Amino acid sequence: ERHIAFLRNYDPTIRRLKKYFFFQNKFEKLLRKLKIDLVYFTGPSQYSLYLEDTDFIITIPDVSHRENLEFPEWTKSSEFQRRDEIISKSSVKAIAVITNAEIIKDKISSFYSVEKERIYVINHRPSLGISNFKNFSEDLSIEIKKKYNLPKKYIFYPAMYLPHKNHKYLIDVIKILNTDLKLEMSAVFCGSDKGYLEKIKKYSEKSGQINNIIFLDFVDDEHLPYLYLNSVALTMPTFSGPTNIPPWEAFMLEVPVLYSDIHNIREVYRDAVFYIDPFEPSTMAKGLVEILTNNSKKNELLNNGKKILQSVDEKKEFNQFYEILKKRRKIKNTWEFNN
């Protein structure tokens, strides 16, 4: 459905014909009616292609579809063309592009020929459910354990069920820990399904680990902190990145993080995570054993995670929004009249 909507509107000739016959497309007509002259898109959106007379800012969190062409969710069924057309056409026209790391800023500039001066870096922050978490409730923790049937020891992975998220890898890790190393360990997954979950479940059955895996959908914001806090670690063998929200949430809640060593990720998380090879499950199994048996290493990761959080000046970063607006207003004042 979204691809059809994209095809209907991305072509500039089609948009000009629509504008000629209907004066403006419905979206831009609504913006004019509401007297809105600047739009902020929180992610790549086909609606940015509708705008011909309205300024906009857009967030581009990653360009993974350019780096990992082997994953179907990024390249098959014309998804690559859809993503790339949206980003290529919107990034060069946006008055500002926002992303989450200097590495991604460089890639956006390189892939899409966007001036670096127009790309602003604003780091990820924990979700509101984590940021607003203050006091641990033992009663609520027990209630959540019962509600989700949480095992005694488990690794936690909050991620959509998609191939690039690498859930298959974690099932292999659990098998190594339980079968080869004789450690009792489970995994708790939570996230929305895009049609891939059934394959993951079948693989866990084939591997003999179905009883050691808990599959959840999205969970309530109030419950999310407890899924982190009751876990052994946040495990992220993902092939996307380098910026994702869960590591920041784990840093805030002081939960160890194991993360894929990909895409210059060390520039972002430095010494705050245990780096693993996303192709080799034994590297994560080794990391989990070290976290379980070496308190010094675990505390080092937790302390470094807190340092990364503290190093981000949230107020200074969000002030970049105001700088974008001030720059736009300053330029517009050179040609715009108030009468």
Task: Walk through the language-model features, giving the residues of each.
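Carbohydrate transferase catalytic cores enriched for Leloir-type hexosyltransferases
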Residues: 1-339
